[in-house]
Amino acid sequence: MNDEVLNMKKVIILGASFLQVPLIKTAKQLGYYTIVADMNPNAEGFEFADKKYVVSTIDTEALLKVAELEKPDGIVTAATDMPMRSIAYIGEKLNLNTISYDTAIKATDKFKMREALNKENVAIPKYFLVNNKEDYKKALKNIKGKKIIKPVDSSGSRGIFLLENEKDIDKAYKHATENSRNRTILVEEYMQGEEVSVETLTSKGETKVVAITDKITTGAPHFIENAHKIQSTKDKDIKTKISQLAIAANKALNIETGLSLIHISEPTRPLY
């Protein structure tokens, strides 16, 4: 390693898929020595990295060993959820500027997230944690009308199912559990209405809303995202309430630093 490289600041980037390529390129443009980790040895982002490690982005202990060896100035990711646990864990171990491990767990576990939001009186739909078929049947009886069935530990709309009738009860359970690493799901009341996504930036505990976008999905039963319209066309009053709710959600999860993406439904009032 030459003197120029030795004098460069190092950043570990978790993920080398096409989603992380812009992050890798930008880090290099900013003068960072990029150390990229991904379990896929053929991940396209490796082409742009200064150094690569073929390691899963959720293998926390293996990544900690990489970080202890490389001694980075920072560790980041983009467009993915679960690696935040690894980032927070390593951040606490090496005293890097990351969210706390407790916050990372709450932000990537939908049940723990709802518990944290509920504790701080942030508006959320009625929900039940389900670990087995018996819990599932009980939860269904406790929520009237349509229900949303979803994994607690998935993202990108994977595993979501809108349950509208009894004939799909088993189908919804199977779809959600198969998309959960620990086969744990949530049963929630369905909030029918338009959805928005809120992009926020938090620094030293102060959150600013960067953008509110109108969310376009495939609709029922899986609600897979197709596109976003930026900025939202909703009126100023609604945007203000959306911003307030997004900031409250960040505070409830104790997010002190970083970017957040919050999905909000506008069934009637209040927002959820």
Where are these regions (language model features)?
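Internal nucleotide-binding/catalytic subdomain
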Residues: 160-260
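Single conserved hydrophobic/aromatic residue that forms the stacking wall/gate
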Residues: 263-272
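A conserved helix-loop-beta module that forms one wall/lid of the active-site cleft
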Residues: 92-159
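ATP-binding N-terminal substructure of ATP-dependent carboxylate-amine bond-forming enzymes
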Residues: 2-103, 134
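Short catalytic-loop micro-motif centered on adjacent basic/acidic residues
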Residues: 12-13, 74-77, 125-126, 162, ...
